[in-house]
Amino acid sequence: MKISVHNYAYGIPYNIILLTVGGLIFGIGVKGIALPHGFISGGFSGLCLLVYYWTGLLPPGVLYFILNVPIFLLGWRYVSRRFFGYSLYGMAILTLSIDLIDLQIAVKDPMLAALVGGCLIGCGSGIIFHSLGSAGGNDVIAVLLNQRFNIRIGTFFFLFNIGLFAFSFVRLPVDLVLFSLAMSFVSSQVLEYVLNISNQRKMALIVSEHSNRIAQEILSRL
């Protein structure tokens, strides 16, 4: 039974479903709440929204795809092929969701909108993180920096979002930035909750001369 569960969790259909459902929910949060209210989310999606508000030249989904191209070119060389493949699919789903979903959730109060948007984005992110891939953007950069320079993933996310929201105060009204911060806080809490629902995915870095033997032993006990 343990082996079958392990194979199911690491199988392609299971991860495709997670990335698809998570990307759709995330896209609904961005297109149905954040974009109509002028909010920005954290991470690369927030950067794309900020650039869109600033320039209005390209839709956020197209910007997200363009910014991900050089990242995935680097990722092809430095991250695992499995993570790369799933992340490429996740990025495509999120790009299409942001651009093609034609939905505006009828929430007029900005604080309620920040709450609903945070719940949707956090839920979508949590489902994506349960897969063996990502939605591209910050996730791929964080893995690259962690592998090449030993920079902690959480540290990179924190510094990126600090810079993003600090710059937002220059380009957007203060009220919108504060509501965006509230939405990001809600999304982070929902993300943690979704991850803890079935927290079976752990990551550990093992440095040893017998890495192959250790890996085989771990897999045999799962």
Q: Where on the chain are the PLM-derived regions?
A:
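Core subunits and conserved enzymes of cellular information-processing
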Residues: K2-N212
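Short amphipathic alpha-helix segments
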Residues: E209-L222
